[in-house]
UniProtKB/Swiss-Prot annotation:
Broadest EC class assigned to this enzyme: transferase
Tagged with keyword tRNA-binding: no
UniProt KW keywords: ATP-binding, Kinase, Nucleotide-binding, Serine/threonine-protein kinase, Sporulation, Transferase
InterPro entries: Anti-sigma-factor_SerPK (IPR050267), Anti-sigma_F (IPR010194), HATPase_C_sf (IPR036890)
A Gene Ontology BP annotation from the UniProt entry: negative regulation of sporulation resulting in formation of a cellular spore
UniProt name for this protein: Anti-sigma F factor
EC number: 2.7.11.1
Catalytic activity as recorded in UniProt: L-seryl-[protein] + ATP = O-phospho-L-seryl-[protein] + ADP + H(+); L-threonyl-[protein] + ATP = O-phospho-L-threonyl-[protein] + ADP + H(+)
Pfam families in alphabetical order: HATPase_c_2 (PF13581)
Keyword ATP-binding found: yes
Family from the record: Belongs to the anti-sigma-factor family.
UniProt source species: Halalkalibacterium halodurans (strain ATCC BAA-125 / DSM 18197 / FERM 7344 / JCM 9153 / C-125) (Bacillus halodurans)
Amino acid sequence: MRNEMNLSFSAQSQNESFARVTVGAFIAQLDPTMDEMTEIKTVVSEAVTNAIIHGYQGQPDGVVYIHASIDQGVFELTIRDEGMGISDVEEARQPLYTTKPELERSGMGFTIMENFMDEVKVVSEPMIGTTVFLKKHLTKSKAICN
C-alpha cells in the first residue's frame, strides 16, 4: 500500500533540520538501514539548503515544498521551490560548480544527491523555480505499506 506525506515551510535555514527529521520519521516505517537513513536525511538537507540559499537567495519569504511517498520499498521524494531557478541544470550538476563560491561546502549538493539516491532528476526554469525528483530503492523493507 502506498503512503504519502506533504510538507511546506518558510525558506529559512533553521527549517532545514525540521525537514530532515520529518522525512526521516516518515521513512522510519520502512525500517531502513542506518546507511539508508543517513543518506536520505543528507539528501534532504542538501536539496532544502539549495532551495533556501540558491533558489530564494536567502530571502525567508519563500516556501519550500516537500512531497514524499513510499510504495513497495521504494522511497520517492520531491523538493520544490518557486525561486530563482537554474539557467543551466547540467552545468549546475557538475561537481564543485557553484554560484556562491564564498560559502563553504559549496558545489557538492547535486553530487551528493546523485551518489546517495538511485535516481535524480532536476527540472528548473529561471524565475519560476526548481524541482528535484529523487528515488531510492531500499534494501531492507518491512514497511506497513508493503
